[in-house]
Design a protein with these regions (language model features):
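A short helix->loop->beta-strand "cap" motif at the edges of active sites that frequently abuts
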Residues: 64, 138, 234-238
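Residues at the N-termini of beta-strands
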Residues: 28, 66, 106, 205, ...
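Active-site clefts of carbohydrate-active enzymes
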Residues: 203-216, 237-251
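N-terminal pre-domain/capping segments
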Residues: 1-102, 118-122, 129, 152-153, ...
Length: 266
């Protein structure tokens, strides 16, 4: 997602993601489904099968590990409308297939579609159970990504009820806005450090969100040392994804700055 502006503008083809990552001396990547669907017309030109072959070929060409794919705009997995929820599950299955084909062990989903906590929890457990049983070799994980899912307490409770090893979380350092806009008008913010601590026991991936940096290279709104101490204390051994979402620095510079900061604490 750090390169979403370049891809949306047409400056960078989403098929060249692996090549671009290698230019930063990065050897593992996370894909975003929307950058092949609703933000570009990639999947209007080629099929899912051709897309998977192309992504695998290009990642192999540049020595890149395909780690994860983030899925958006494929329906509401927490919806109380059964027909809508089952359709969302079905929509996500083709992306589980693509994940397996390109070697991604993990696929991130969102839990949207319901504001009532009890209904949201019940619906989320049903959908996650179905998706994780569809292919037990693929980890289907949930990111704190707005609404009820941005509560570490609520999301970790869902995980405890699913009870499948390949079901888990993707803690994002920045996405803890439960109400309002996370871009300046958030009316209910969950404590990001508590939330990360609550989600890490179930983590199959981690997103290091960043927005801006001071003269010493520190993130101006997130204490990276504190965050990485939480990550390491949990025993997590996987990749930490770079997710720069700022405006002052360009995307390339933001990626480089986030990488340098992470390297101080890993």
């Amino acid at each position: 997602w750090s390169l979403n502006k370049a891809i949306k503008s047409g400056e960078l083809s989403p098929l060249d993601f692996a090549k671009k990552a290698r230019s930063f001396d990065i050897d593992a990547i996370e894909y975003v489904s929307g950058l092949y669907t609703n933000h570009t017309d990639t999947l209007k030109k080629i099929s899912m099968q051709k897309l998977s072959k192309e992504l695998l070929k290009r990642s192999d060409d540049y020595g890149i590990d395909n780690v994860l794919i983030m899925i958006d705009s494929q329906g509401s997995l927490a919806s109380s409308n059964k027909k809508e929820r089952l359709k969302a599950i079905d929509n996500h299955k083709k992306w589980i297939d693509l994940s397996a084909e390109i070697g991604c062990k993990t696929m991130r989903v969102n839990l949207n579609g319901e504001k009532d906590l009890n209904k949201w929890t019940k619906n989320s457990v049903k959908s996650l159970t179905a998706l994780n049983k569809y292919n037990e070799n693929i980890n289907v994980v949930v990111e704190n990504h707005g609404g009820l899912s941005s509560s570490g307490k609520y999301l970790s409770n869902v995980m405890s009820k699913v009870k499948l090893e390949n079901c888990g979380t993707l803690p994002d350092f920045g996405n803890f806005c439960m109400n309002g806009s996370p871009w300046g008008n958030c009316t209910q913010m969950y404590d990001r450090y508590l939330g990360t601590e609550e989600l890490m026991p179930y983590a199959h991936a981690v997103s290091a969100k960043s927005y801006d940096f001071d003269d010493q290279g520190n993130e101006t709104s997130i204490d990276y040392k504190r965050m990485m101490d939480i990550v390491k204390k949990s025993g997590y051994q996987g990749y930490v994804g770079i997710e720069y979402e700022g405006n002052r620095l360009g995307e390339d510079d933001g990626i480089i700055a986030t990488k340098k900061l992470l390297q101080k604490f890993i």
